[in-house]
Amino acid sequence: MRRICVLAFLCVVFQQAVNGQYNVKTFGAKADGVTLDTRFIQQAIDKAYSSKGGTVEVPAGTYKIGTLILKDNVELHLQHGATLIGSANYKDYIAVKQQQATRTKDLYAKYFMIFAEGASNIAITGSGIIHGNGLKNFQETRPQNLRPYMIRLVGCNNVTVKGVKILEAANWSFHLLNCKDVNIDGIVIENRGEGNRDGLDIDACQRVTVANSRFSTTDDAIVMKATNDTLCQDIAISNCLFHEIGGSALKTGTESNGGFKNITVSNCVIKDIDHHAGIELMTVDGGMMQNILFENITMDNVATPFFIRLGIRSRPYKPGQYVNHIDDVRDIQLNNISVVNAKLPSSIIGLHNKKISNITITNYTVRSAVAQDAVAYNRVSFQEFDYPAASMFENLPAYALYCRSVENLNLQNVNMYAATGEKRPAITMDRTDHVSLSGVKAETKSKTSPMIHLRNAEDVTIAQSRSFDANDVLVETEENTVKGLRMLNNLLHPSQSEQKAVAALTDASVFEDFETTIKYEIEKGSTVKNMTAHDLSTSLPVTLKMTKKGSLQLCLLVLNESSTPQKLTIKYDGITQDFMVNWKDWGWAPITLLKQYDKDQQVKFEVSAAGAGLKISKVYVRYQDIGFTD
C-alpha cells in the first residue's frame, strides 16, 4: 500500500512537471493557517525553477509563511480563496543579505515575505490574498527594519504582478528596487497601523506600468524613489483609485539621489487625505526631476492638492558616498485636474539659487474648504534642508497657489474658489520670472484683498483673467520689485482697479540662514550681491571645532560668476571632496563629510576652486540624522 502511495505521488509530480504547474499541497503545504508552510511552498518554487520555469499553484486555504524566494521563470499563482499570511514570529523569516547598494538596504528592512534579487521573468498572479498580519503584530515602529516587508523585488527584469490583494503590511507593502520592465495590473493594496506602511514603492526602476489598481494605506500609496544613484524613469500610472491615504497618494521622494524622469500619471481618483498631498513631486538629495505629466485627476477632501519642491537635504545613500551637485527640476505639466474640499493651498517652491522651471498648469479647478490666517509675504520659511512635505508650509499667503523661486510658469484656464471668510489672495508669487497667466479666474472673499499678489517678479503676463467677486484690485504688486508686468484684456468689475502697487516688504534673507554654533563667516572682502565674499581663486583655510559626534555636513554659501559650472573643492585630513556649483546667486553647497569627528575636535579645512568665478561668504556645519527612515 505504501509503495502504491509513493508511486501515486511521483505520478502527480511528473504530471505537474509536464504541464509546468506545481501545486504547493502536493509538496506538503497544509493550508490550515497554523502550520508554517514556507518550506513546502519554497520547494514548489525551487522545483519549478530547476525545471526551467513553471507556475506554482496555491489553492484555496490559509498558508502561514515566513520568507519565500522567487526565482527565474516562476509564476506564483494564488487561486481564489488562497491567502498567504505572514508569521508573527521573527524567527520564521530569513534575514536576507541584499547585494545592491541602496539606502533601504538593512536600514529599512531585512525581513521579507516574498523576496527576489536578480530574477527574470517572474510573476505573482491570481485573485488570492497576501496578508502581512501587520495590524496585530510588529507594532513597534522603530527600528523600522524589525518589521517585515511584504514583497521586495530587487534588480529583477520582466516582472508581472496581477490581480492579487496585498493587505495589512507591517512595513512597506510592495517595494520594487532597480527593476526593469514591470507590469502591475488590477491589484489592491490596503493597510492600517502606525509607522512607514507604504503601498507601492517604485525605486530606481525603469519601464514600469501600474494600472487599474486600488490603494488605501497608512503612509504613501504610490511613491517613486531613488534610494541610490540610479534614475527612476519611464513610469506610467493610470486608472487607479486612492482612498483614505495617511501619506500622499502619488509622490516622488523623499529619497531622491538618482532622480526622476519621464513619469506619466493619468485618469486617477484621489479621496480623503487628511495631512498630506494628492500629488507631491519632490527632489531633495541632488537628483533631477524632468518631464513629468499628471492629467485627468480628480480629488476630494485632500489636505493639499499638489506640492512641487526642490530642496537641499543632500543625504547620502550609503557610507563613503556624498551628494556632489544639485540637479534641475523642470518640465512638469499638470492638466485637467479638479479638486474639491482642499484644506491647504498648493505650492511650487524652489531655491533662491536654483529655480524650478518650465511648469505648465492647464484646466485646473480647485475649491478650498478651509480659510486660514497667513504669514506675511516676506516671512514664508525656507526649510531647505528639512524633510520635505506639503504641510511644512502651512499658513501660506495664498489660499490656492503659492509659488517661490520658479521660472517659465504657465497657468491657463484655471478656476479657484475660496472658503467662507478667506482673506488671502488666490495666488501669490515671489521670485518668479517669465510667467504667463491666461484665463485665470478666482474668488476673492475680502474686498480689500487682491486676486493675485506679486513680489520680486520679472516678465509677467496676465491676460483674459478676472475675479468672480468685486474686490478692489485684480493684481497687487510690491513697489519696485516687479519688472515687465503686462496686463492684457482682463475683465474688471466696475470700480475695480486692474493693478495697484503697495509698499515693498523687506526680506530678512533669501536663503535659509539656519541655526548652528559651528560657523565661519567672511568678514573682509568684496561685496557681492549684498554679501561679504572671498574669491576662491585663492584658497580659504577654515578651522572649525565640533560640538558633538555624528554625521556632519559642511555647508558652504557660494555663488558662481562664471558662465559655466565650476568645481568647488574641500580638503581635510587627507580627504578631497568636490562639489559642482551651477548657479549664479547665493546658495548653499551642502557636502556630507566622509569622516566623523568627536566632540571638541578641531578640523582644518581648505576650500578652493579649480577655475575662476566662485565666491564664498559662509561656512556652516550641520548634523545629519542619516539613520532616519522616510
Where do the protein language model's features map onto the residues?
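Short beta-strand-plus-loop segments that form exposed binding edges in beta-rich domains
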Residues: 605-613
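Glycan-recognition and processing domains
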Residues: 501-545, 557, 616-630
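Short, surface-exposed beta-strand/strand-loop-strand elements in extracellular ectodomains
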Residues: 564-575
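Extracellular/periplasmic carbohydrate-active domains that bind, remodel
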Residues: 10, 16-504, 559-563, 580-587
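Sec-dependent N-terminal signal peptides
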Residues: 6-8
